[in-house]
């Protein structure tokens, strides 16, 4: 009997993304997924994700503290003893993945690296200091193949890493935070706008608050939820306290509450000043909710204006307010965009479709 193709996925971060990918890939090949104990189940309950075909998951303590002295070597052995045909890693500026990629460089194994942010964000986020830049360079130089999320991200990667000689291909960012099938759907609350995520400056919270001020002055019925942690919550905390239509949630949000938040929104706002792709966008579509988003980075590769959301120029509060008003005041438009979000989730952002294309790439690079 022929040996089945084997893929090892090393994911100290992006646990939900990696688990959904592994579950879809397992229909085509044997998969071993290595996760970080700190990251697994933090944002989403992995037990809620359907996995019709079994695969092997190893959860290790990956830290630079004493406990990581055992977990880190074990995680490397998890990869090597699986005897994979391909190893797939995520780029994140930390020492675990950089060390594994350089170790694997001593072998003939193909090394696939998913680059989530080809260019660091302008204000805040990871990859914005010299140490993280060096780690990113180490990982990219050790990769035999790079995947990014969308065609615009290929251009960004080529600009950021002009000396990279391997192949770069697009593999879309699949849906996240999809509610379990047994859950009762949450009905959208009339006029509710959700702004969700890690609150760094590039996310455009200041632009969003300016747009909410405009909606209030125009008398547009709305309520906005700003949910997440980060420095911008502290910077704009007092301002939000004085805005009656805003409910700010600066606290940990459980997976169940996160799903309910997305479903309760009529529209999700992503007024990013710059972006590659967005897990928040993937989560909005995973919950069949349309978006009003900035036309920047890889977002227009996923959001088709007037189909599954509305696109606006970045840092333009008036354009953002106008687009939000259109969705909130037109039931037919809101319904059409919601259907478009559902179709996108079932189409280009469906993990089965993504895994099928990735598996073809794995076979090709391993041949």
Predicted regions mapped to residue ranges:
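Donor nucleotide-sugar binding/catalytic pocket of nucleotide-sugar-dependent glycosyltransferases
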Residues: 141-180
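Nucleotide-activated donor-binding/catalytic signature segment of Leloir-type glycosyltransferases, i.e.
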Residues: 236-259
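Acidic donor-binding loop of glycosyltransferase active sites
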Residues: 260-276, 289
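Conserved acidic donor-binding segment of nucleotide-sugar-dependent glycosyltransferases
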Residues: 305-306, 310-317, 326-332
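A short, well-ordered alpha-helix in the C-terminal region of glycosyltransferases
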Residues: 319, 326, 333-348, 354-357
């Amino acid at each position: 009997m022929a040996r089945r193709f084997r893929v090892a996925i090393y994911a100290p971060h992006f646990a939900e993304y990696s688990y959904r990918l592994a579950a879809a890939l397992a229909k085509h090949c044997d998969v071993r997924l290595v996760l970080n104990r700190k990251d697994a189940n933090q944002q989403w309950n992995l037990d809620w994700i359907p996995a019709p075909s079994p695969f092997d998951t190893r959860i290790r303590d990956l830290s630079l503290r004493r406990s990581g002295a055992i977990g880190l070597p074990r995680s490397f052995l998890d990869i090597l003893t699986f005897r994979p045909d391909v190893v797939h890693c995520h780029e994140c500026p930390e020492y675990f993945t950089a060390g594994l990629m350089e170790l694997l460089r001593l072998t003939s194994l193909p090394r696939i690296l998913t680059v989530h942010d080809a260019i660091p964000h302008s204000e805040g986020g990871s990859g914005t200091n010299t140490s993280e830049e060096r780690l990113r360079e180490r990982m990219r130089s050790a990769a035999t193949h790079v995947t990014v999320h969308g065609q615009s991200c290929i251009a960004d990667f080529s600009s950021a890493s002009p000396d990279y000689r391997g192949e770069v291909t697009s593999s879309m960012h699949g849906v996240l935070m999809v509610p379990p099938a047994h859950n009762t759907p949450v009905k959208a609350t009339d006029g509710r706008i959700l702004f969700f995520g890690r609150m760094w400056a590039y996310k455009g919270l200041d632009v969003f608050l300016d747009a909410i001020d405009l909606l209030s002055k125009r008398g547009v019925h709305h309520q906005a939820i700003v949910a997440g942690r980060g420095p911008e919550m502290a910077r704009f905390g007092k301002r939000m306290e004085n805005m009656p239509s805003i409910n700010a949630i600066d606290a940990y949000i459980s997976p169940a509450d996160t799903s309910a938040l997305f479903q309760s929104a009529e529209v999700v706002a992503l007024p990013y000043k710059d972006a590659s792709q967005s897990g928040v966008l993937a989560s909005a579509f995973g919950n069949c909710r349309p978006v009003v988003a900035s036309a920047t980075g890889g977002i227009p590769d996923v959001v088709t204006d007037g189909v599954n959301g509305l696109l606006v120029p970045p840092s333009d509060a008036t354009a953002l307010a106008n687009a939000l008003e259109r969705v909130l005041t037109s039931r037919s438009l809101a319904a059409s965009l919601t259907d478009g979000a559902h179709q996108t989730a079932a189409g280009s952002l469906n993990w089965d479709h993504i895994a099928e294309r990735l598996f073809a790439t794995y076979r090709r690079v391993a041949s």
